[in-house]
Amino acid sequence: MAPSEKKLTEDKKNSSLNKKIETSNSSSEKSSENNNGDSQNNEAPKTFKELGVIDELCEACEKLGFKTPTPIQQEAIPVVLNKRDVIGLAQTGSGKTAAFALPVIQELWNNPSPFFAVVLAPTRELAYQISEQFEAIGGSIGVRSVVIVGGMDMVTQAVALSKKPHVLVCTPGRLMDHLENTKGFSLKNLKYLIMDEADRLLDMDFGPIIDKILKIIPHERRTLLFSATMTSKVEKLQRASLHQPVRVAVSSKFSTVDTLIQRYLFFPFKHKDTYLVYLVNELAGNSIIIFARTVNDTQRLAILLRTLGFSAIPLHGQLSQSNRLGALNKFKSGARSTLVATDVAARGLDIPLVDVVINYDIPTDSKAYIHRVGRTARAGRAGKSIALVTQYDLEPFLRIEATIGKKMQEYEIDKEGVFLLSERVGEAQREAIIQMKEIHDRRKSKGKLHTKRKRDDLDREEQIY
């Protein structure tokens, strides 16, 4: 028996703790849903304990700074504790990872076993962050989580699987690889399957692989499906994988949160970089994510800002897995105050305390805008977003305003202060062009373009430009 399983088992034998667990479970059975499968929670609980969460996990929540349950946590946790399948719909930044991690860990506490739960995630970064959440919440009771994603060594992962962790957090392609090829690995005792960002999983064409996984894993299991939107593909997956699910919809409307202050700046296209630098300078001391449309602009803007003395770092799909994780960790730790990213960072990544989101490029898809600005003002906190609008962006910008049902106010600036930066920004632009050419030349000389594609390519975060 693995040490963490032994710890869980020994703790469970404590009779007084068993009584507390039984009390928590019985209270969760009284809260929840009607026979139609709709969540009914007339009086929202104010604490995790009122949701049926045991004291040990309530203490973990307190240490992590989870003061009160978010709406999706209030709705989903009692239903999962009542051993029902769940389909959860919630806007971005709602705290849904803890909404499934807490009750699953509590069930693991009651019935410790290896390969207790599998979480499917659309991207590698999201998989690592979900795993971190499981270990942060369940670390005090010995919960072990392993990440199984593409781009990493199969043999090393097989060794990790042989140690029989409690929770696997996977991208679908690599999980299927191990189910087919890793000797001795099976999910025959799986108790929970969780699909996070289900709409994105299906948008990235993981559907056929998920269908294969569903045929292999036990039918007698609980399934939790979380999605930002209810698409026809998600509805089809729900019918195929969930048994009489309870639907918990915190927000059925695709919208931004109320704590987000949204502003825009309008100016001629030729001054775009200068306005960006002005903003980053004005917002110095804040944690900032800048979203650009292409990998090239992401890299160029990071170089431009660094040349001007700002601690910026790029994040995009052409970086190696280790470099992507390194960029995220530097930004999350505060070692870099500005992250310049493509839409690889727009969904799923749990980056705490992002103060400002700047849309350097206005996305043509209004939903992409909502996911981007959802990186700030998360879980009840305040945040700010600023959209850079040129004469070429008016149509998509007006569509975004129509989608969110709000007219944005213009961000107040000192225009004279903007143009005082023009000369310095021009010099930095020229330096960025030189460095970009050097980067492209190095890539060409190393011959890094690969034409052969494997299943792991489905685990990529976005198209390579």
UniProtKB/Swiss-Prot annotation:
**Superkingdom, natural source:** Eukaryota
Q: Where is the composition biased (Basic and acidic residues)?
A: 1-22, 454-465
Q: Which residue intervals define the domain Helicase ATP-binding in the entry?
A: 77-248
Q: Which gene encodes it?
A: rrp3
Q: Where in the cell is it found?
A: Nucleus
Q: Which GO terms describe its biological process?
A: rRNA processing
Q: Where is this motif: Q motif?
A: 46-74
| UniProt name for this protein | ATP-dependent rRNA helicase rrp3
Entry's Gene Ontology cellular component terms: cytosol; nucleolus; nucleus
Q: Which PANTHER family match?
A: ATP-DEPENDENT RNA HELICASE RHLE-RELATED, RNA HELICASE
What is the enzyme's class at the highest EC level?
hydrolase
Helicase C-terminal domain residues: 275-419
Q: What is known of its domains?
A: The Q motif is unique to and characteristic of the DEAD box family of RNA helicases and controls ATP binding and hydrolysis.
Q: What is its EC number?
A: 3.6.4.13
Q: Does the keyword Transferase apply?
A: no
Fill in the subunit field for this protein: Interacts with the SSU processome.
Enzymatic reactions: ATP + H2O = ADP + phosphate + H(+)
Q: Which family does it belong to?
A: Belongs to the DEAD box helicase family. DDX47/RRP3 subfamily.
Q: Where is this motif: DEAD box?
A: 196-199
Q: What segment(s) does the record annotate as region Disordered?
A: 1-44, 442-465
Binding-site residues for ATP, renumbered to this chain = 90-97
The job of this chain, per UniProt, is described as: ATP-dependent rRNA helicase required for pre-ribosomal RNA processing. Involved in the maturation of the 35S-pre-rRNA and to its cleavage to mature 18S rRNA.
**GO molecular function ontology, one term from the record:** ATP hydrolysis activity
Compositional bias (Basic residues) spans?
442-453
Primary location recorded for the protein, binned into one broad class: nucleus
